Amino acid sequence: MRIEAAVTSISWIPSEAVTGLTKAGFTSGAMHYDDPPPDYLEDLAELHKSGRFRFANRLAAWAEVEDGQVVDAGYAGRGYISTTRVSFGARGGVTFQPTEFPELRAEPELHGDHAVFSQTVGGRTGVPFPRPVRGKPFFQWVAPTVWTTLQLVIRADGTFTSELTSASKFPRHWIYDNDGRLAARENCLDDPFADEHLQACHRGGAGGVVRFHG
């Protein structure tokens, strides 16, 4: 018997998350904020095509079960990162391509009656912004990075558990369960272009993770 499950993170920038020098690019109309993603994730590829988010990590996996034991397991799913469009009003605009990082997938761990999967995907957005740094020159032009690490446990009885175990310092990471329902909202940082020394956020309940059940 094959059991399949998935967990998805969507990362986006709300209007209240950008402050300081970088806010001018958004308020001028050259850049755009993101509308909140839907509460129910029906078609991730279509949301990506329409530019509704900056980044998504979809961890999908399967486990083959025989006599109550997991005998084989594997991954599906992928990461999505959107282009960045800079508008020049009536003169048009320019679309900048992001840089995708290699997908990091741990080998499925088979533990008798369950299997554990872990996936990290992300990238660097297409347009650099001024970011404050310690010491001279006090600002650097750097494109923000965005990534999440998701974990999925599939059990032989057909149940599963999903976790957001770590994430980059990006304003919003929303987590969707196997059925596409919004399961958690993580506000990791108010400004994606803030202090470069804040490399990651670890949020949630016990152990610093966001955990929910399927």
Where are these regions (language model features)?
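Beta-strand-dense domains in secreted/periplasmic systems and polymorphic toxin scaffolds
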Residues: 185-187
